[in-house]
Amino acid sequence: MSLSTEKKAAIVAEFGRDAKDTGSSEVQIALLTAQINHLQSHFATHKKDHHGRRGLLRMVSRRRKLLDYLKRTNLELYTSTIARLGLRR
């Protein structure tokens, strides 16, 4: 299940540069992190959902690529983003 519109708007407001900033790397990373966290709770109860697990791995890979890009282009924004999201790195 995807995120609700209100939850997405709250994430964009928190991580975006303005209210309509949906394309910046940090917003995309935050949205993917919220979806990944939601899917992890889904897999706690639905252990045999292998099709959904493939989608989860795809999201994790996409987030990793965005994090690598952000680290390469803006190191201080990268460190603040992973600290705010609670990601290890």
From Swiss-Prot:
Q: Any idea which GO molecular function terms this record carries? A: rRNA binding; structural constituent of ribosome
Q: Which GO terms describe its biological process?
A: translation
Highest rank taxon of the organism = Bacteria
Task: List the InterPro entries hit by this protein, alphabetically.
Answer: Ribosomal_uS15, Ribosomal_uS15_bac-type, uS15_NS1_RNA-bd_sf
For this protein, the record's Pfam families field holds: Ribosomal_S15 (PF00312)
Q: Which residues form a coiled coil?
A: none
Q: How does it assemble?
A: Part of the 30S ribosomal subunit. Forms a bridge to the 50S subunit in the 70S ribosome, contacting the 23S rRNA.
Membership in a protein family: Belongs to the universal ribosomal protein uS15 family.
Instruction: State what this protein does.
Output: One of the primary rRNA binding proteins, it binds directly to 16S rRNA where it helps nucleate assembly of the platform of the 30S subunit by binding and bridging several RNA helices of the 16S rRNA. Forms an intersubunit bridge (bridge B4) with the 23S rRNA of the 50S subunit in the ribosome.
Q: What is this protein called?
A: Small ribosomal subunit protein uS15
To which species is this protein native? Pasteurella multocida (strain Pm70)
Gene behind this protein: rpsO
